[in-house]
């Protein structure tokens, strides 16, 4: 029958800032610059103090982006670093996703993150005239370079595709192939997320939702195109049709990502209660088990202080 294990990361999200210089038309996360203050270390410490380290392992640091040429950029990076260091001090394992970074920025954050991430989304440049026409950092070549840079720096990395934002099915194969090629060079990709576009109340333009009935086929293609040691992840809160969810697992999806109190990217789609989700999977013959934000095969890649932190935390 084979391995019938599905993993997830018990997680909590810290948002340094919702302000972002990109204006992706489908975004339900960003706010205009100057409309909301940044998360202070004091406020973050209060949020972390309310968590149970026995139940939460990962602190996802998910941030809006400050423009590369902004005078606020260095302050922003310092805040990302300090929040990750704070999470480590409180007994959690940080994973940062904050948009494209320079080599120096990525190197700095490597010291305080057990893994990092950036969605490639889609490799086709045509989206730069569509949903990404006001989003400079969504240049696909810039994002592909980030994957390469993470590999060169030996950073365990998560990436993925955003489905249903104006691309064609052949674009999925091109994007998956590019991820596979980068992983064959560096071996650093932990998982690839297949995220269906799911409309929310805050986005600037109404896009139709991705047709979930296509998702099992995308999972199947991903499994055939990606190396076997890359895990395929689907967000359980966005795959709202049970039979589609089940078909995705049978097609090769093996991880549900971070299960958090609030999905800040898709705030209109709450996660199913964990006990209910476990029961549902069990009825289908699957066992849901927690994991850390760094996969076991990558622990030895980490700087010694981080490696020790990981060893202190039970799965």
UniProtKB/Swiss-Prot annotation:
UniProt-recorded name of the protein: 7,8-didemethyl-8-hydroxy-5-deazariboflavin synthase
Reaction(s) the record says it catalyses: 5-amino-5-(4-hydroxybenzyl)-6-(D-ribitylimino)-5,6-dihydrouracil + S-adenosyl-L-methionine = 7,8-didemethyl-8-hydroxy-5-deazariboflavin + 5'-deoxyadenosine + L-methionine + NH4(+) + H(+)
Family per similarity comment: Belongs to the radical SAM superfamily. CofG family.
Statement: the UniProt record of this protein carries the keyword 4Fe-4S: yes
Classification via NCBIfam families: F420_cofG, PRK06245.1
Binding sites annotated in the UniProt record for [4Fe-4S] cluster: 20, 24, 27
Cofactors demanded by this protein: [4Fe-4S] cluster
EC nos: 4.3.1.32
Cross-referenced SMART domains: Elp3
Native source organism of the sequence: Thermosynechococcus vestitus (strain NIES-2133 / IAM M-273 / BP-1)
Alphabetical keyword list: 4Fe-4S, Iron, Iron-sulfur, Lyase, Metal-binding, S-adenosyl-L-methionine
Gene Ontology MF, one: transferase activity, transferring alkyl or aryl (other than methyl) groups
Pfam families given in the database record: Radical_SAM
Function: Catalyzes the radical-mediated synthesis of 7,8-didemethyl-8-hydroxy-5-deazariboflavin from 5-amino-5-(4-hydroxybenzyl)-6-(D-ribitylimino)-5,6-dihydrouracil.
